[in-house]
Structure formats: structure tokens, C-alpha cells
């Protein structure tokens, strides 16, 4: 798993920045104001991937394939969030771009045994997943205190995903499909509603707990997303780590039945 951030701040410099004296490190974005306020976040997402797709198993019999069965590691995904607020009203945009996948070679058991192979047969297999999720929402601040802010939100999310499975058998057994490929794709627009917020704590309000939750439907039977974690507010910006899950359920009769991404995030945020 590779970290997408190419520039690394030395730990000693980061510590020095975090320990700068000040009355309060809480950002202007989370304090009461009628001015325009902006926040941009850049972070990496390191998810495990699960789900089910339908592929032919050497004939007409459908086969449910768990995406996580083929993935022993994933590439990190790029993620960015932009927020704007004036008074209690605001806007929220989040984009996630993922290119995930792995392969196995010489295995006797493809997909954890869900695709049975004849005796003496081995296989090479690969699974590639490309996905982009874009969330757009309007926000309204329902709670605003010196330590806590909570927004309700309503909007839409787009998921554009493709899953490609390839396999090659190394057996000459009659009736065995030597090579195969199956690709399913899905574009889904769904309406969502949710809430997000931050709570600061510590002597100078330098620590905070960020959280986010939404759910909706549309082209998908159900989509939901949730995240929570901890962060540190410095004078130059914020550092935060969360656990995030993005889940889609398209129904049992779809080629792409469901797909989910869950794992840690690590990033920075800047307010102005």
C-alpha cells in the first residue's frame, strides 16, 4: 500500500508548529461568523474493499464473487474536500478517486473456493476496481458553540465504478474454460441527507473530534457513508485521522450487487 502524499514534513518541524503558543487553536471555520469562510482538506484513504459481482462460472451458473477475496493489498486513494460557509448556510463537496486491485498466481482456489477448479488445475487471476465518488451538498448549521459545531446537509452523490475480473487456467482438462474476463460497471446518482460536525477539547481547544454521516437512495437501493476520528488544530492548519466507510447496495438482481470501501484516512486541512 503506497502513501499518495509525496511531500513529508519533518516530525520535529511539525511538533514545533503544533506547540506554538496561543489562546485557542480552534479554526475560524468552526467559530460563529457572518463572513465568508473556507476549508480545504487533502488526505489519503487506505481502504479494504468488499462487495459482490456476478460472473459466469464456465457456463450459465452465476457466481457471487467477493471483491475482498482477491485483494491482498490496495493502492491508496486520492481524496479532497472543499467547504464554504457564510453565517449558518454553506456548501460541501467531496471527491474520492480510487484505483485498486491485486492478482494471484498459481492458485488452486480462486475467490476463496467459490470458483471450483478440477484436480490438477491452477489459475492466475486479477481483480481491478476503479471508482470515483463525488458528493455535493448544501449545509445548514443547527448548533454552534465555542466548542461544538453541527451541520445538517442535503444533496447528491455520484458513484462511477467498474470491476474487472480476469482468470487463466493452466489445465488441459476437457470442458475447463482456459481464460475468462468479466467486467461490470455502474454509474449511480443518489440523493442523500446527513449531518457532520466537530467538537473541540483541551486547554486551548487544540484537539477535536470530527465526524460525518449520510444516507440516501436513488439509482442504488441504499448508499450510506460514515466517518469519525481525532485531529489536532495548529496555527497553520489541522492534522486529522479518521476511520471511514462508504457503502452501496444495488440489489441482488444487479451485476454489481454491492460494493463498500472502509479504512483509515490521514490528512491535513486549511482554513481561510
Feature-to-residue mapping (PLM):
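Predominantly the C-terminal beta-signal and adjacent terminal strand-loop region
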Residues: 226-272
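Residues on the lipid-exposed face of transmembrane beta-strands in outer-membrane beta-barrel proteins
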Residues: 40-42, 80-86, 136-140, 154-156, ...
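Short glycine/proline- and aromatic-enriched beta-strand/turn motifs that initiate or cap beta-hairpins
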Residues: 25-98, 202
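Extracellular/periplasm-exposed beta-strand and loop segments of Gram-negative cell-envelope proteins
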Residues: 48-75, 97-132, 159-188, 218, ...
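Short loop/turn motifs that connect adjacent beta-strands in outer-membrane beta-barrel proteins
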Residues: 27-36, 143-149, 201-207, 236
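Residues that define the transmembrane beta-barrel architecture of outer-membrane proteins
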Residues: 34-36, 74-78, 130-134, 148, ...
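Cleavable N-terminal export/targeting peptides
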Residues: 1-35
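Transmembrane beta-strand segments that form the barrel wall of outer-membrane beta-barrel proteins
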Residues: 206-221, 245
Amino acid at each position: 500500500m503506497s502513501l499518495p502524499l509525496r511531500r513529508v514534513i519533518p516530525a520535529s518541524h511539525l511538533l514545533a508548529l503544533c506547540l506554538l503558543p496561543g489562546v485557542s487553536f480552534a479554526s475560524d471555520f468552526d467559530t460563529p461568523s457572518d463572513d465568508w469562510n473556507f476549508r480545504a482538506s487533502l488526505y489519503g484513504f487506505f481502504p479494504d474493499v468488499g462487495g459482490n459481482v456476478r460472473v459466469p462460472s464456465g457456463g450459465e451458473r452465476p457466481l457471487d464473487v467477493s471483491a475482498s477475496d482477491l485483494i491482498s493489498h490496495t493502492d491508496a486513494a486520492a481524496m479532497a474536500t472543499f467547504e464554504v460557509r457564510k453565517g449558518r448556510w454553506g456548501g460541501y463537496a467531496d471527491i474520492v478517486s480510487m484505483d485498486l486491485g491485486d492478482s494471484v498466481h498459481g492458485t488452486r482456489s480462486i475467490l476463496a473456493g467459490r470458483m471450483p477448479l478440477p484436480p490438477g488445475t491452477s489459475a492466475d487471476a486479477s481483480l481491478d476496481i476503479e471508482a470515483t465518488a463525488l458528493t455535493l451538498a448544501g449545509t445548514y448549521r443547527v448548533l454552534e458553540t465555542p466548542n461544538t459545531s453541527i451541520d445538517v446537509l442535503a444533496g447528491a452523490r455520484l458513484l462511477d465504478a467498474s470491476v474487472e475480473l480476469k482468470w487463466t487456467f493452466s489445465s488441459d482438462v476437457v470442458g475447463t474454460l482456459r481464460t475468462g474476463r468479466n467486467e461490470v460497471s455502474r454509474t449511480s446518482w443518489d440523493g442523500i441527507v446527513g449531518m457532520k460536525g466537530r467538537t473541540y477539547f483541551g486547554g486551548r481547544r487544540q484537539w477535536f473530534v470530527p465526524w460525518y454521516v449520510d444516507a440516501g437512495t436513488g439509482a442504488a437501493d441504499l448508499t450510506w457513508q460514515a466517518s469519525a476520528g481525532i485531529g489536532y488544530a495548529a496555527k497553520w492548519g489541522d492534522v486529522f485521522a479518521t476511520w471511514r466507510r462508504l457503502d452501496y447496495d444495488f440489489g441482488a438482481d444487479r451485476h454489481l450487487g454491492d460494493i463498500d470501501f472502509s479504512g483509515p484516512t490521514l490528512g491535513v486541512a486549511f482554513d481561510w
